[in-house]
Curated annotation (Swiss-Prot):
GO MF entries: copper ion binding
Signal peptide: none
Protein keywords: Lipoprotein, Metal-binding, Methylation, Prenylation, Repeat
Disruption outcome: Strongly increased bacterial disease susceptibility.
Protein known as: Heavy metal-associated isoprenylated plant protein 5
Pfam families: HMA
Cysteines joined through disulfide linkages: none
Length: 386
């Protein structure tokens, strides 16, 4: 019985030796310690609870809650505090701060900066970290690339089509979420959105066009040429004005020539126009100019003699007999003529009212004219000796 029990004991003693061999040759390199020392060769970087401060761009309270929820799911985190005003995130726990930083940058798509670096590691942990650095030393030995220069603060006016108040609030909310934007001022009447902050216009315009799904145009202020553009315009307009000057003179001359006849009529009109023509020297000049323009214009001469005859006719002591409607047979028209008086100062035609009658004329009645008046030049109906 004793020999049978010794067999299993020998096997149990050989088992630890079998387990030690693979541990020593795991990485293909001999290690100084046993299995327990090899397992404890890579402990976590932060063995104690510590607090780390990260700088993350947080726009609002909702953004801060989202980041806090994301960090709490990370292993070893005990507490998370977010400061929206200062864009700071305080994380407390047994964590690797560098891994958490990379995780946050991957999830939020934003730049995350570790404000307080982790404390220096001493002992076996430092040796393990040194070996890791030695493995990837070529990558970390390269000098860091110089950081791009931060854009200066600027004010950018943009032309965006605005429909209503809800549309304005939506656009304002979208623009404020863009990194680097500080304030947004919107003028709904002019469809102008003014953005202030440390932003690049070349990157902002295509980004807003994609997010808003409408045309976005930057408004560039007009350059001051110190009047150079105006001088060029005046110089270009000067030869055109010279070309137009002679043609305008010809048109005016034609117009004046065509108006000659009208001006002659003004000269040869009735007594009132004659009086006006005799009032001042200026109007006489106009009358004289009308005569000269008659030669140029070639208008038809006005019947001056007929006008004078009518003047004589109006004031003559021997007027012609007027024409009257003939007395009707059907409707009864009565033009009872009591008689005609020919006073020296004028004439009168007494008669009764009007009635409808047939259409015919009474022949002229020859007035009683004295012998000297028949041959007078002032009488338009007088006789003349040939």
């Amino acid at each position: 019985m004793g020999e049978v029990q010794e067999g299993p004991k020998v096997e149990q003693e050989k088992k630890p030796a079998a387990t030690v061999v693979p541990v020593e040759t795991t990485d293909g390199k001999p290690k100084s310690g046993g299995g327990d020392s090899a397992a404890a060769a890579a402990p976590p970087v932060a063995a104690v609870v510590s607090a780390f401060v990260y700088k993350v761009d947080m726009h609002c309270e909702g953004c801060a809650k989202k980041i806090k929820r994301m960090v709490k799911h990370f292993d070893g985190v005990k507490d998370v505090t977010a400061d929206t005003g200062g864009n700071k995130l305080l994380v407390v726990g047994k964590i690797d701060p560098v891994k958490l930083q990379e995780k946050l940058e991957e999830k939020t798509k934003r730049k995350v900066v570790l404000a307080n670096p982790p404390p220096k590691v001493e002992g076996p942990v430092a040796a393990a970290v040194g070996e890791k650095k030695a493995d990837g030393g070529d990558k970390e030995a390269a000098p860091p690339a110089p950081a791009p220069a931060a854009p200066k603060e600027s004010v950018v006016p943009l032309k965006i089509r605005l429909h209503c108040e809800g549309c304005i609030q939506k656009i304002k909310k979208i623009i404020l979420k863009i990194k680097g934007v500080e304030t947004v001022a919107i003028d709904g009447a002019k469809d102008v959105v003014t953005v202030k902050g440390t932003i690049d216009v070349k990157e902002l315009v295509p980004l807003l066009t994609k997010k808003l799904k409408r045309t976005v145009e930057p408004l560039v202020p007009a350059k001051k040429d110190d009047g150079a553009a105006e001088n060029k315009k005046t110089e270009a307009a000067a030869p055109d004005a010279k070309k137009e000057a002679p043609s305008a003179g010809v048109n005016e001359a034609k117009k004046e020539g065509s108006d000659g006849g009208e001006k002659k009529k003004e000269v040869g009109d009735g007594g009132e126009k004659k009086k006006e023509g005799g009032d001042g020297g200026e109007k006489k000049k106009e009358a004289g100019d009308g005569g000269e323009k008659k030669k140029d214009g070639g208008g038809v001469p006005a019947p001056v003699a007929m006008v004078n005859k009518m003047d004589y006719y109006g004031y003559s002591a021997y007027p012609t007999a007027p024409m009257h409607w003939q007395e009707g047979h059907v409707y009864g028209q009565s033009y009872s003529m009591t008689g005609q008086n020919y006073p020296v100062g004028g004439q009168s035609y007494p008669g009764s009212g009007y009635n409808y009658a047939s259409e015919s004329y009474v022949p002229y009645a020859q007035p009683n004219v004295n012998a000297p008046g028949m041959f007078s030049d002032e009488n338009p109906n007088g006789c003349s000796v040939m």
